[in-house]
Structures are given as structure tokens and as C-alpha cells.
């Protein structure tokens, strides 16, 4: 008994399904047996078809700055009314919606006007929903690659305004009229709709605003009908963290190394130039990386490119400064003469201002009196030379202790043997050469000190130039913000 009842229920359910399918099939034949999809759904030729449009963004795939191409994944919601597909669900078993292939009904043929790859249409021809009263709804997905003029002035702290321009490929403004869709609360959706649950956030770009506007263009001079464009603007802001970590911070650190060249000795010009040129080469590599990222345009220079050019100029000036300081440090009295004014400014005044003067000289103790042993040696030499007894020499020494015996010695040396005179001349020559070398060493030391003074001046100048220039360049990016447009945020 229970089995028979179950079979009866299954049979009734199958009959009900079959009846429902028959009602849909009957509705299908009722609507499409005499339907012409190539004819516009109007009763009079001057009538206009109203098209309700809604764009839902599911993914901001990428913005290729090099090719100036924006890739997006969207759903295009299109609603309109076709009087030829009007029916009452009461006449067809309560069928509320009929799903039919899109090629069976009239379509407004909406395309993306500013596409870049020739794909004007949608990615998948979804079914069209036909509802009671002749209302049609079509929601096809699409992946668009559109043009986007990239402004690189403040890269990587920039924001871009990319547009999606839709229009009917076949019909003009007098044949179709575009309006924005309305939500369940009756509010007009005049922007790109972003479903926070379905939207996939982009790691490089954040969407700030996405307003839409409908713009009608006038016809030609002959009075022909114009076109209607639906323009959606995607105002996106770059997330600069990737570029800060991978480009800006290493670039600033490497550029700061060039200042370390001033801590090398003034005579080490080769090593200082090597440090500066190595930094210059590293900056060239960073500039090459930025050139591969930004579009090939002469309209503007990226902020990061301007910074790299600035630090390259600073590094070049430091190389020139190292060469000049090396030239000054290696000068000698035989090739150059130091003027008193230059000596005063660079060796006296400037070190005091910079707090880098030479250490104070330690006063030397007075030379001790000549010991008796040295006096005995002198007397022994005079005895040998003058052939006088030691007692007489001692007597003369006691009588002329303060200078007279030295004069007598010099007079008697004039009559001495030629060999002794040659020795004395050689000793005098050595003493004179030693005095000349000491004087020359002091002059060379002054030139080295002058090179150090120039190094100190240029170090502080380069440090101030580096800090001020870097601050001014990056502060410009701080003020480059998305303007507060009179549009609600997208998310």
C-alpha cells in the first residue's frame, strides 16, 4: 500500500514537471515564432528605446603603465523593454521568467569604445531573461583591455583617471536612450557598482572614486543624429609600499654613501673617486629599472626619475670636488705659492668656524744646559785642530766662555787643512738642506690642510644639498592627492 502511494506521488510530480516544461515551450513558441531579432522594438520609427545600464566591477586586474593599458573584469547589466515579448504569466501556467539565447532577441549592441585589443563585445554570450510585461535583462561578463593615459609626474606616489566608454555600435542617440539603473531602494546607480563580497582587491591599486556620466554628442554639420556615450571613470591610487621598500629606500641609502668619500684623507683622491663613481653606477641601474616601468613619454618626468637625476648630479659634483681637492693637496712650494689671504681664510678663519682647527701646540721645555761631556768633546776637537795644550784651551775657555772661543775656532778653521774644510762644508750643506726640507715640509703640510678645509666645506655643502633636495622632491609627492570630487566613494 505504501509503495503504491509513493509511485502515485512520483507520477504526479513528473506530470507536473512536464506540464511546466510544456508551458515554457508554449510560451517560447508564442513569443518567438514570429519574432524578428533584427528589428528595433518600437511601434513607431520615431520612438526611442530606453536602455538601463549598470556596470559591476569584479576585479581590477592590472594597469600596465608601459603600454598604458587597463585590464578589468566586469559584469554589464542591460535592461530594456520589448513590446513584442509581452505576455501574462497567468496565461502560461505562472511562468515568470523565460531564459533564451541572446542571439534570439534584439540587443542594443553596446561595446567598449576605448578598447585596445579589438575586443568590443562581451566575453560570454549569456542567456537573456524575458519577464512578464516584455522586460528583458541581460548580464554578460566581460574582460576589457582599455586605453588609459598614464600621468607619471609623481610616480610612484601617483593616481590615475582611467575611463570606460560605452556606446551602442549600431544605433544613434535618437534610436536608443541610455539611463543609469536603479537599485532596490529606488536610487540611481550613477557609478560603477562594486560588490565587496565578490570584488578581488588589487595589490598595487586602490579605487577611490568611480563616477559615471551620460554624454550625448551632437550630430554632424548636416544635422544628422548624434551619439550617446556612457563614461565610467576609475580614479585609482597607487599603493607605493612596494616601490618604497624595493627602490626608494635602497636608492636613498646608496646615494647617501657618496658622502662617505669626504671621510677619506684629502690625498686619497683615487679611492674617493672610486667610491663616488661606484655610487654613480648604482644610481644608473636604478634609473634603468624605472625607465622600464614607466611609459616612453616626453610629457613629464617621474618623481623617482627626477630624484635619481638629482643624486647623480650630486655624485658627479663630488667626483669633481675630489679631483680638485687632490690637486690642491699635492701642491708643493716649487709649483705653487699660497697667497696670504688664502692662507688666512682657509687655514685660520674657516677651521675656527667649522670647529676643526689644528690642535694647540704643546709648549716645549727649555733645552738643558750643555753637559760637561759635550764641552770636553769640543775641547778635544779644538786641541787636535789647533795643536794647543789642553790647559791653555781650558784657560781660554774659562776666559771666553760665552762666545769668544767659538769665534777663534772659526778663524783657525780657515787655516786648517783642506780635508777638514771639506768636512765642515759638507756638514753645513747637510744642515742647510735639513732646514730647507723642514721649510718645504711646512709648506706641503699647509697645502694638505687647505685640501682638508676644502673637503670640510664641500662635505657640509653636499650634505645640505642632499637633504634639502631630497626633502623638496619627496614633499611634492605628499601634496599629490586625489582631489575631493563631488562623488561618493566606490567602496
Curated annotation (Swiss-Prot):
Q: Which is one GO molecular function term here?
A: transmitter-gated monoatomic ion channel activity involved in regulation of postsynaptic membrane potential
Give the Cytoplasmic compartment stretches of this protein.
265-272, 329-456
- Signal sequence interval, chain numbering: 1-20
Q: Which PROSITE patterns match?
A: NEUROTR_ION_CHANNEL
Subcellular location(s): the record lists: Postsynaptic cell membrane; Cell membrane
Q: Which residues cross the membrane?
A: 240-264, 273-291, 307-328, 457-480
Mostly located where? membrane
Keyword field contains Repeat = no
User: InterPro entries given for it?
Assistant: Neur_chan_lig-bd (IPR006202), Neur_chan_lig-bd_sf (IPR036734), Neur_channel (IPR006201), Neuro-gated_channel_TM_sf (IPR036719), Neuro_actylchol_rec (IPR038050), Neurotrans-gated_channel_TM (IPR006029), Neurotransmitter_ion_chnl_CS (IPR018000), Nicotinic_acetylcholine_rcpt (IPR002394)
Keyword Disulfide bond present in the record's keywords: the answer is: yes
State which ranges are Extracellular (membrane side). 21-239, 292-306, 481-491
Which SUPFAM superfamilies does the annotation name? Answer: Neurotransmitter-gated ion-channel transmembrane pore (SSF90112), Nicotinic receptor ligand binding domain-like (SSF63712)
Q: Which GO terms describe its biological process?
A: acetylcholine receptor signaling pathway; chemical synaptic transmission; membrane depolarization; monoatomic ion transmembrane transport
- S-S pairs: 148-162
Outline what the protein does. Answer: After binding acetylcholine, the AChR responds by an extensive change in conformation that affects all subunits and leads to opening of an ion-conducting channel across the plasma membrane.
Kindly provide the name given to this protein in its UniProt entry: Acetylcholine receptor subunit epsilon
- Tell me the name of the encoding gene: CHRNE
